Amino acid sequence: MKIITLCGSTKFKEAFEQANAFLTLQGNIVISLAFFEQSEGFEITEKQAELLGNLHFRKIDISDEIFVVDVNGYIGSSTRREIEYAKEKGKAIRYYSNGEISSNVLRTMKPNELI
């Protein structure tokens, strides 16, 4: 069991949900985002954005690794900073774009393969 923080653009809510389910069903503790403002049209203030960014770095601090939700290889500037931070802290880093998780992962895996 590992503690894994999901990192990536908030416009990829569905991919975050897939990654969260996949990694959780492997027996991991998954820490995700609080808001998906880009995919839900939710607006936050600059001060709130700064708070959420700082909290995300603390999430990385308590994690064993990060899982980057980089749909089609997209990595924005905030996610790039999170990756660099995780590297500096010696955290393992995995990427969604490596194909470990497909959109039908929960339908194709047998229960005994999940753990």
Per-region residue spans from a language model:
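Conserved catalytic or regulatory cores that recognize and/or transform ribose-phosphate-containing ligands
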Residues: 1-115
